[in-house]
A protein has these predicted regions:
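Non-cysteine beta-strand/loop elements that form the S-adenosyl-L-methionine
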Residues: 98-106
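Solvent-exposed alpha-helix faces
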Residues: 129, 147-148
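Amphipathic alpha-helix from the class-I
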Residues: 132-136
């Protein structure tokens, strides 16, 4: 971290306020700060515009909190990784399909079979296929329902 927690909270608060004021989507990336994240967002839940939790890799409890807040959950190529994505595969059914935001996180987190290569937008298809497989749906059902 290059800034103090106090500075980060102040910046995040300004980000939230601006998003509410302009009613523009709130795009969030949280790591190891879920409790603080929720403490800052819950009081303004009703005012928040559409909100995406980018590249979700948190716990079951954190996911439930985010789903209950009505947030979109960003799923990346991480879910295609047999080693690191296992816990996400176990959680994916907790997310309503229309609240899954399929993301590339380009240029990082390329899905298998492209691990180690530069991630590109066309690779979202691999992520959608993995979600379809886990949820027992067709690729078409996932593509029609998720906000790609």
């Amino acid at each position: 971290n290059f800034s103090t927690k106090k500075q980060q909270k102040k910046s995040f608060e300004a980000h939230i306020e601006t998003s509410i004021e302009l009613q523009k989507p709130l795009f969030l990336h949280v790591r190891e700060a879920h409790q603080t994240f929720m403490e800052m967002l819950k009081p303004v839940k009703e005012e928040l515009p559409k909100t995406v939790v980018h590249c979700f890799t948190g716990t079951r409890e954190e996911l439930i909190d985010c789903v209950e807040m009505g947030f979109y959950i960003g799923i990346t190529g991480w879910i295609c990784d047999e080693r690191r994505g296992t816990h996400l595969k176990d959680l994916i059914n907790l997310i309503p399909l229309n609240k899954i935001m399929i993301e590339t996180d380009s240029p990082y987190l390329a899905p298998i079979p492209h691990r180690g290569k530069r991630n590109e937008p066309y690779m979202v298809n691999f992520i959608a296929e993995e979600i379809a497989k886990i949820k027992g749906l067709t690729l078409e059902e996932v593509a029609k329902t998720t906000p790609l």
